């Protein structure tokens, strides 16, 4: 029942990122990276020592044979080297410039394999005839060739031509829970896998078949733990493996079958050897893409996959074309870089806004001009003309007015912007100034008295009352038709010095 529910809850992946969960739980990544670097350093030192020994031997050989060579032969060799090197350099640069791409088909296929084929309903319904187990028990031959397992293991070993050109035996030697090119081969079932692991005879023959295919690839099994190494004929077999790329599909099948039949620990050493030969030693350069795209992702343990990918990333050339790395860390580094570049500009923008907003707060309203008295008598008429042009109806809103019985109006300024007026019975308006900024001087001097509202507010109320009584201005109505002169001003005190009132505002018609 559990398998049925897993099939119902399974969601088909739609992207490569959905299929690849290698870097999702990268716990202990730093420790793994340190271990990988230590292994790489040790391997690098060993390779350098071997290279140094080879160089010393070559130098000795060239020194011994250099006396026999003539000058013309050396010139010809140098010319040939100059001719061939540019072509090799161009081809290598062209190959390096091609950036690889992830295959969604490969990622989805290996995702299903690592998750034990969640949509494989056939595994639940198919009859358990155990064809693969009976073949390994040497009870039935494989179809369609009709050859038993013992004949394959004994007579086909070392026959590289037969192993290369026959395409029907590999599905029987390394069965999977998926259909292959040989439609006569039966798919594995979960029940058959359990029975296969329990049968020692079948497991023994399975290991022998694995050794036979390793020999075909130029590799040999070193121990029972699955460690592998180069075979004596590795140079010839690696060259053949580099040219016959259809064998990469066989390697992928072998790796999958190892995991199905209980030999998951055999896969990392074999994959690492292929990465070593294809990326580092460059003996099988055509295998590079398949090793990174297929072989690595047959391993079910994420930690093992990360180790192998770090090893490959360390040696991959050019490094910017390595697309199997941790995407989360790359994005985090990019985000950090973008944050460092964006924060100064944003701070500048905020400071610029603050600089612009500060002057707006410091703007003050213009102060109302005070009444000024000209010392020269000839300028009195000019001052009165300016007063007439600038007088407005705000006198009513700024000053307090009193309407008397005789029609005159007396206005009193109360040092506030919204003054009040009192209308008299006679129709005149009396305005009383209480917000003047006048500073009293000596009684003998003829200087002007300024009407400053701020200075007047600081005075006590008693002083303001006396000042207002001395500076009463009576506005009289003169002519109805006159628009230029709104009113005539007459001093309210007996003093010979005339106090003039200048009101700032918009122009209005005469009082009625």
Curated annotation (Swiss-Prot):
Residues 28-54, 62-71 have a biased composition (Acidic residues). Belongs to the opioid growth factor receptor family. InterPro entries: OGF_rcpt, OGFr. This is Opioid growth factor receptor-like protein 1. PANTHER family: OPIOID GROWTH FACTOR RECEPTOR OGFR ZETA-TYPE OPIOID RECEPTOR, OPIOID GROWTH FACTOR RECEPTOR-LIKE PROTEIN 1. Residues 408-421, 490-499 have a biased composition (Polar residues). GO terms for molecular function: opioid growth factor receptor activity. Residues 347-361 have a biased composition (Basic residues). Residues 1-72, 323-469, 488-512 are annotated as: Disordered. It comes from the Eukaryota. One of its GO terms (cellular component) is membrane. It comes from Xenopus tropicalis. Residues 328-337, 449-468 have a biased composition (Basic and acidic residues).
């Amino acid at each position: 029942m559990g398998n049925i529910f897993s099939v119902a809850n399974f969601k088909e992946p739609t992207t490569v990122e959905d299929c690849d969960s290698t870097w999702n739980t990268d716990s202990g990544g730093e420790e793994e990276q340190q271990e990988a670097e230590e292994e790489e350093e040790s391997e690098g030192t060993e390779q350098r020592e071997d290279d140094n020994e080879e160089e010393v031997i070559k130098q000795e050989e060239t020194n011994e044979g250099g006396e026999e060579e003539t000058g013309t032969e050396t010139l010809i060799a140098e010319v040939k080297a100059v001719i061939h090197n540019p072509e090799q350099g161009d081809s290598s640069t062209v190959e390096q410039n091609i950036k690889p791409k992830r295959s969604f088909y490969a990622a989805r296929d290996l995702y299903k394999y690592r998750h034990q084929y969640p949509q494989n309903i056939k595994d639940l319904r198919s009859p358990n005839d155990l064809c693969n187990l009976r073949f390994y028990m040497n009870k039935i031959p494989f179809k369609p060739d009709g050859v038993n397992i013992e004949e394959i293991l004994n007579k086909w070993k070392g026959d590289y031509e037969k192993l290369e050109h026959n395409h029907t035996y590999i599905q029987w030697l390394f069965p999977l829970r998926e259909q292959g090119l040989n439609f006569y081969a039966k798919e594995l079932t979960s029940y058959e896998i359990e029975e296969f692991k329990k049968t020692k005879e079948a497991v023994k023959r399975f290991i022998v078949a694995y050794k036979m295919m390793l020999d075909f690839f130029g590799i040999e099994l070193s121990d029972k733990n699955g460690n592998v190494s180069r075979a004596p004929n590795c140079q010839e077999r690696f060259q053949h493996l580099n040219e016959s790329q259809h064998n990469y599909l066989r390697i992928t099948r072998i790796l999958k079958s190892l995991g199905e039949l209980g030999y998951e620990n055999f896969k990392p050493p074999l994959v690492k050897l292929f990465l070593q030969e294809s990326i580092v030693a460059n003996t099988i350069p055509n295998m590079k893409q398949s090793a990174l795209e297929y072989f690595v992702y047959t391993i079910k343990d994420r930690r093992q996959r990360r180790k192998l990918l770090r090893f490959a990333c360390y040696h991959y050339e050019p490094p910017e074309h390595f697309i199997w790395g941790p995407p989360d860390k790359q994005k985090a580094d990019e985000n950090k870089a973008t944050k460092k570049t964006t924060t100064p500009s944003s701070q500048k923008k905020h400071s610029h806004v603050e600089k612009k907003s500060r002057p707006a707060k410091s703007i003050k309203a213009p102060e109302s001009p005070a009444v000024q008295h000209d010392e020269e008598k000839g300028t009195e008429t000019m001052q009165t003309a300016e007063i007439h042009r600038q007088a407005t109806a705000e006198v009513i809103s700024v000053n307090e007015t009193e309407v008397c019985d005789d029609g005159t109006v007396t206005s009193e300024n109360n040092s506030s912007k919204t003054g009040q007026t009192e209308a008299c019975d006679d129709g005149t308006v009396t305005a009383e100034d209480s917000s003047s900024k006048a500073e009293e001087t000596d009684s003998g001097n003829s200087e002007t008295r300024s009407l400053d509202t701020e200075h007047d507010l600081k005075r006590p109320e008693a002083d303001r009352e006396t000042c207002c009584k001395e500076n009463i201005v009576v506005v009289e109505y003169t002519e109805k038709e006159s628009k230029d002169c709104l009113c005539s001003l007459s001093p309210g005190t007996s003093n010979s010095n005339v106090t003039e009132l200048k009101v700032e505002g918009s122009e209005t018609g005469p009082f009625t």
